[in-house]
Amino acid sequence: MNRALLLTVFDRPHYLDPVLDAWAAVRGLADWHVRVAVEPSDVAGEVVGLVDAFVRRTGHRDVEVVLNPTRLGVLENPYVHLDALFAAGHDFVVRAEDDLLVSDDVLELFAHVATTYAAEPTVATAHAFSAGPADADHAELARTDAFCPWVWGTWRDRWTGLLGPTWDRDYSTFNGSPGFETGWDWNLNTRVFPSRGLGAVAPLASRVRNIGEVGEHGTPDDLVPAPSFAAHVPTQVFRERGRVH
């Protein structure tokens, strides 16, 4: 299976620096194509410098750094680069962001899910986040009816047949009034998933922690804690438990 990691980056090098440190420690990174999509900003030079240092440190030979010629924004930036990666022939793509810390086994998790659930079209996405308790079992996976945008992955057939065509690219989807539960992530979670009976697979113990207290649409009040997150997780033999609603 041809797998890729998409990291979208904007103007927060103070978040990006520890996030790249975390990704540098991730096992199996060398097996994934990496695309870093950088939005233009006043600190784009500093951001690209951090990415270049990450590439030198990891020695990863399959990394492309794409500086968007114009700012695409939070709707278009992930869409454009996800679509490009699938069009280039990748079978499974994980999307990460510049303010999301990850565990060192996160790609082992995604590699397992990508293979195990490839033939289950109702599993639309794979997630790294969980709000589970601190003592959650790192090996356990569960199905969920909700979509979570904090480091997630999907397959090419799900993208081309469903997620791409239904992506909210202009805030035209909403619940009740414009601006309420709108955007691509809300659209997937509150409309696309329930209307089509779709779900996701996620770990009980989170493999991601959001450190982005300040962002395009983020405030400290928006952060959901991840008490089960650990930076270092031994290699697991993953297993699925019952469905979580």
Annotated model-derived regions:
Residues 1-96, 100-245:
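Peripheral/terminal regions associated with large enzymatic or DNA-binding modules
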